[in-house]
Amino acid sequence: IVMVNDPVRKDMYRKLVNAGAVGFISIAGSPLDEGVDLVPRAYALPKNLPGEEKKEAGREAVNYDNRIPGVSIHYKDAIELVTKGASQVCLSVEQEIVTRTSRNVVARIEGTDKAEEILTLTAHYDSVPEGPGAYDNMSGAAIIMELCRYFHAHRPRRTMEFIWFGAEEKGLLGSQNYIKIHENELSAHRFNMNVDLAGQLVGGTVAGVTGDASVCSILTYMAHEIGIGMSTKNQIWGSDSNTFAWKGIPAMTLNRDGFGMH
């Protein structure tokens, strides 16, 4: 059994399996936590069953001959295990395996003279166990809703879709489902603007662009013209904009960094 001082994701899981580990313990929390001995954690691992492979265009096939169990414990418990030199640990687990259905919500406003071209404004509405989700990401969902109200009253030239994605925190599942269902109209998509994290009074605004560097230049120019303090980064972004970029659609995530995420 291996104790790992990091979240166990795909690459680490592969190393553990290949090394012959029979299980793993990952560590969460901080020695500064007071009155806390539990920290909610959920990490997505490959869903492949033993002997199966999942192949997707542009993505690495993952195959495991066996599966190993793992558990996340608090930092303080990890220190106790190490200092006491524990060689055996009894772990009791009570859990229920459930399946849930997530949904996307789409509002479409037809354009006027360029209705055949589509712009998408998106935000995910799900959250994680660590917090109620006001910052991540009901703040973004609220911004998209207000923009939808505005453009409903002021018709845009291009068709606009306002999309609230579910299951983003589970691996961009909502946006991937949208792309799959709307595959035949993706050629009409011109740009995706995603909002993920907003509303921090003290912080910095970042536009994370996954697309041509010229998009960064245009956004920087526009922000300067209207007096918005904003930096741009040209990179892959860990949010639903990445799903659109994967299909060749220029995309960005508007992000307001601040203290803490949840």
Residue map of PLM features:
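Non-catalytic positions within long, well-ordered alpha-helices that form the structural scaffold/packing
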Residues: 17-20, 152, 245
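Metal-dependent peptidase/peptidase-like ectodomains
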Residues: 53-61, 68-70, 78-79, 155-156, ...
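Solvent-exposed loop/turn segments at secondary-structure junctions
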Residues: 7-10, 29-33, 77-78, 96-99, ...
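Second-shell loop/turn segments in exported
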Residues: 3-7, 12-13, 66-71, 93-95, ...
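Soluble metallo-hydrolase cores and metallopeptidase-like ectodomains found primarily
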Residues: 49-134, 146-153, 157-159, 180
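Extracellular/luminal Protease-associated
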Residues: 1-61, 132, 230
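Short, conserved micro-motifs enriched in small and acidic residues
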Residues: 130-142, 169
